[in-house]
């Protein structure tokens, strides 16, 4: 399945559901309490993060998609913490505020990256479904997907009214279901239960065949557009009427914390569908996102650069031959990680030991090496008739196989100045015995604060000499 990074900036999503605050007390533990056989935690840091439906909205915004959120809170400091955090992330929050009920808070006591205790502060909300529906209807015209983030805490009491309102606007509805009554999600475009939630409705599934059969029957009964069952370490399974099941293996490299993984799945799905991705591609992106987030501690969001790198790994484009557009994307991501970009260029017609040594020295000037290669027309103009010996595709393929080289790209001009202006490397490297000021592009690189270096060439290593020797043989 071919994956690409969606245009999330053009994918507005509305999230409606149970808003909560995830609060973390971090501290050290070095002794047991004399009062009871429990550890004593010396609290050193208090951290608040949006949770529940608020975490879904935060994940959507972190991907770069416009996110709006409708939910219910109390009139307290936890609400203000949510408002501040969401505003800082660019989420437009519309909260129904209840004076006599608290905002839901999940307090976790953490020590040495381990959760020791969780305390829940909550009461079922006594909400006004009509007021919530009014808020949602006022926002539907400006979004492309509606997400129902249901934790069974009372914010969502009119599921069918919300689904029907979205359908009148032609907007797909995604629901992360809770409880043992999935009838309330009838007519949804997609629901995303985990395996435990799914089996609580349909009964135990002995194998994948039974899961598929029971899932198909559930879709028929509830008139669902699709069903996605998330299965932890076994990945996820997408079922659609009149389509073969799609099984995707889990992508996590290391699992530290599954908190909020379901939120990440539905948020990535929603943003991807809003950006115009087909459902299988959106599910594959959500699977990659889940694999990233479970490698983080606590309720966490993933960023667009993190997902983009995962897509590039999946498509085998993290290294190697690239288009200019692909190169600019990976350079941007590498720079965001604090990596120093090195740039060099040349014809590299017949690769020899001198080239390899030079490229290794160039790579040592930073963290990532970009090699820009003259295309065939450019080489012919520079070197004369009969050159290049090897086509640009072959030259680039050989360079991409070198350990020192991260990315290879070609250019059609006689000099790489236009490409340099786009890449803006931290270090421009050229091999030869001339001065820095004679290097093409040196003025451009130095003007924005970059560094230009000239490396010596390996003696008795010349492509031109090799070509002449072969011709005389």
UniProtKB/Swiss-Prot annotation:
| A cellular component term, taken from the record's GO annotations | cytosol
Annotated InterPro entries: Bifunc_HldE, Carboh/pur_kinase_PfkB_CS, Cyt_trans-like, PfkB_dom, RfaE_dom_I, RfaE_dom_II, Ribokinase-like, Rossmann-like_a/b/a_fold
Does this UniProt record's set of keywords contain Kinase?
A: yes
Q: What is this protein called?
A: Bifunctional protein HldE
Q: What class of enzyme is it?
A: transferase
Q: Keyword Transferase on this protein?
A: yes
In Pfam terms, one family for this protein is PfkB
Entry's family note: In the N-terminal section; belongs to the carbohydrate kinase PfkB family.
Give the record's keywords alphabetically.
ATP-binding, Carbohydrate metabolism, Kinase, Multifunctional enzyme, Nucleotide-binding, Nucleotidyltransferase, Transferase
Active site positions, chain numbering: 263
Recorded hits in NCBIfam families, A to Z, give: cyt_tran_rel, PRK11316.1, rfaE_dom_I, rfaE_dom_II
UniProt EC number? 2.7.1.167, 2.7.7.70
What gene codes for this chain? hldE
Q: Where is this region: Ribokinase?
A: 1-318
Write out the residues that bind ATP. Answer: 194-197
Record's signal peptide: none
What would be an example GO MF term here? heptose-1-phosphate adenylyltransferase activity
Pathway involvement? Nucleotide-sugar biosynthesis; ADP-L-glycero-beta-D-manno-heptose biosynthesis; ADP-L-glycero-beta-D-manno-heptose from D-glycero-beta-D-manno-heptose 7-phosphate: step 1/4; Nucleotide-sugar biosynthesis; ADP-L-glycero-beta-D-manno-heptose biosynthesis; ADP-L-glycero-beta-D-manno-heptose from D-glycero-beta-D-manno-heptose 7-phosphate: step 3/4
Q: Catalytic activity, per the record?
A: D-glycero-beta-D-manno-heptose 7-phosphate + ATP = D-glycero-beta-D-manno-heptose 1,7-bisphosphate + ADP + H(+); D-glycero-beta-D-manno-heptose 1-phosphate + ATP + H(+) = ADP-D-glycero-beta-D-manno-heptose + diphosphate
Function comment: Catalyzes the ADP transfer from ATP to D-glycero-beta-D-manno-heptose 1-phosphate, yielding ADP-D-glycero-beta-D-manno-heptose.
Any one GO BP annotation for this protein: ADP-L-glycero-beta-D-manno-heptose biosynthetic process
Assembly and binders: Homodimer.
- Entry-linked Gene3D superfamilies: 3.40.1190.20, HUPs (3.40.50.620)
Location of region: Cytidylyltransferase: 343-473
Specify the species. Stutzerimonas stutzeri (strain A1501)
């Amino acid at each position: 399945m071919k994956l690409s990074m969606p245009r999330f900036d053009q994918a507005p999503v509305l999230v409606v559901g149970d808003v909560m605050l995830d609060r973390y007390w971090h501290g050290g533990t070095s002794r047991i309490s004399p009062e009871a056989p429990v550890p004593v935690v010396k609290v050193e840091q208090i951290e608040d993060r949006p949770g529940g439906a608020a975490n879904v909205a935060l994940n959507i915004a972190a991907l770069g998609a416009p996110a709006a959120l409708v939910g219910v809170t109390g009139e307290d400091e936890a609400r203000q913490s949510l408002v501040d955090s969401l505003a800082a992330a660019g989420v437009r929050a519309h909260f129904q505020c209840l004076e006599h009920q608290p905002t839901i808070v999940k307090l976790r006591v953490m020590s040495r990256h381990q959760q020791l205790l969780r305390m829940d502060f909550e009461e079922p909300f006594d909400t006004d479904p009509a007021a919530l529906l009014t808020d949602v209807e006022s926002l539907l015209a400006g979004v492309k997907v509606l997400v129902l983030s249901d934790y069974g805490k009372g914010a969502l009491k009119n599921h069918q009214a919300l689904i029907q309102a979205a359908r009148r606007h032609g907007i797909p509805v995604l629901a992360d279901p809770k409880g043992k009554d999935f009838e309330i999600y009838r007519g949804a475009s997609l629901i995303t239960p985990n395996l435990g939630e799914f089996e609580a409705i349909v009964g135990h599934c002995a194998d994948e065949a039974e899961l598929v059969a029971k899932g198909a029957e559930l879709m028929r009964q509830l008139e669902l557009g699709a069903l996605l069952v998330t299965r932890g370490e076994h990945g996820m399974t997408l079922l659609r009427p009149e389509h073969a099941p799609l099984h995707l293996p889990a992508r996590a490299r290391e699992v530290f914390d599954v908190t909020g993984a379901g939120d990440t799945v539905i948020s990535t799905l929603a943003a991807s569908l809003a950006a115009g991705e087909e459902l299988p591609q959106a599910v594959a992106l959500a699977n990659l996102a889940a694999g990233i987030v479970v490698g983080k501690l606590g309720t966490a969001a993933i960023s667009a650069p993190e997902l983009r790198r995962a897509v590039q790994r999946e498509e085998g484009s993290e290294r190697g031959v690239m288009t200019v557009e692909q190169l600019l994307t990976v350079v941007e991501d590498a720079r965001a990680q604090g990596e120093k970009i090195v740039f060099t260029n040349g014809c590299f017609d017949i690769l020899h030991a001198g080239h390899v040594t030079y490229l290794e020295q160039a790579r040592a000037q930073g963290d990532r090496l970009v090699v820009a290669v003259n295309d065939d027309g450019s080489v012919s103009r520079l070197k004369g008739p009969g050159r290049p010996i090897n086509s640009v595709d072959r030259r680039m393929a050989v360079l991409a196989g070198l350990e020192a080289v991260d990315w290879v790209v070609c250019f059609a001009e006689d000099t790489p100045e236009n490409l340099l202006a786009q890449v803006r490397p931290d270090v421009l490297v050229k091999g030869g015995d001339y001065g820095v000021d004679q290097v093409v592009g040196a003025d451009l690189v130095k003007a924005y604060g970059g560094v230009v270096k000239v490396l010596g060439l390996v003696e008795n290593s010349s492509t031109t000499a090799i070509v002449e020797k072969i011709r005389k043989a």
